[in-house]
Amino acid sequence: KNSTAVTEIQIAEQYRYMELVRRLFPERERFVFMQTFGCQQNEADSERLCGMAESMGYTVTGDPEQADLIIVNPCAVREHAELKTLSIAGQYKHIKEKNPDLIIGICGCMVSQDHRTLDIKNKYPYIDFLFGTFDNYRFPEILYKTLTSGKRILLGNEGDAAIAEGLPVHRFSSFKAWVSIMYGCNNFCTYCVVP
């Protein structure tokens, strides 16, 4: 796949969606719980997703029971992370039964695999949204459409890899930062879904 830069207009559109989500719940504090498995790129992506969530009015929490939004960001290269993700998704079902307004999403390279997307779509009906790494920058739009339509938004990787700069980031550490030095690769390793 090719990498393309996200335009300033596309970034501005995501900021518009951030404001629209913020306006949906102006009087209530909302919390986001992020669960990350796998590589350092996933850590960097999770920081970006949490930054966007904060811009939409969410506060990062370490307690999934407190969350209004749960995001799981697993790695597809490591099978253990995939299996752990599906197991944890099953545990989150019980939280959603207690809190039907809870929104649960899975993102990352695991979702980029068609068989995993189909598996989640069919076996995990309480998962509200899925999107692959190419659509990380569209998280505000995907969340807004999930919240306002009441329908599941299930995307794999749409189009080309997107390089999006200028979106908010939440750093989990005060003394280190995950920095992406490349997006994708062209080695076409048989075990990897990235290219």
Residue ranges and their predicted role:
Residues K1-P195:
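Proteins enriched for Cys/Gly/acidic motifs involved in redox and nucleic-acid/cofactor modification
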